[in-house]
Amino acid sequence: MQHLQPNTTLQGGKYKIERVLGQGGFGNTYVGYNTEFEETVAIKEFFMKGVTERNETTSVVSVSNADNVQQFEEQREKFKKEARRLRKLKNEHIVKVHDLFEENGTAYYVMDFIDGESLAEKMKKTGQPFTEAEVRSILSQILEALKEVHQTEIWHLDLKPGNIMIDKRGNAYLIDFGASKQIRANGSMTTSTALCYTPGYAPNEQIGQMYDRFGPWTDIYALGATVYNLLTNKKPPMAIDIEEDEEDAFDFPTTVSNDMRKLVVWMMQP
């Protein structure tokens, strides 16, 4: 059993699991209910697929192989750091974290529940790109979120349509800070391991693991690639294929304005 069953309670009954919202390689996300405040929440659980297993009777998570215990503990600490980073961010376009705790041999954090879907899910469902007006609205909102993130000296490092949620009112939210890194006081970055990235959304410094070249521009590149994908419903070009100030690597629909084309090309400068 990889996920908690409906009606499972956490923190002495404070939270109740309602259903699974999503599953990934490092965790499960649930729709939950805060019984104290009588409100729906999202609950993220650290669970390493292929490394951990769950007792069906007690719901306790354990490591399948003793050789993976250290890896599990290190990744669980990163999971908790992700929650703490999110907790510090105060912007209406970033999901708020309200609680962090350990239980069942693993860790959980509780967030606002967004009644919506990711931009990637929405495009997959409709089979159509977003209109330029819709993209401009989304871009404006995510830039607000990134301003807060970067002022806190955090780089998101995994910005893409799958990591932006949109609700039924058109409000956009930047989510999933699992790959994010924070700059220490001495200017170094909080990582000693190789970083994963999504092809098409990563600039050259990220592909080449050149940590000393990371900065706000790394996220701006990914946001430009996201805008391109939303406008075209096509995979963005790889950074290595983009020439400076040239549109040759891009395939915009004729409906996209010249100003928007220039903006995307500028954001995705190699």
Enumerate the predicted regions with their spans.
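Activation-segment/catalytic-loop signature of the eukaryotic protein kinase fold
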Residues: 100
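Conserved short submotifs of the Hanks-type protein kinase catalytic core
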Residues: 104-118, 122
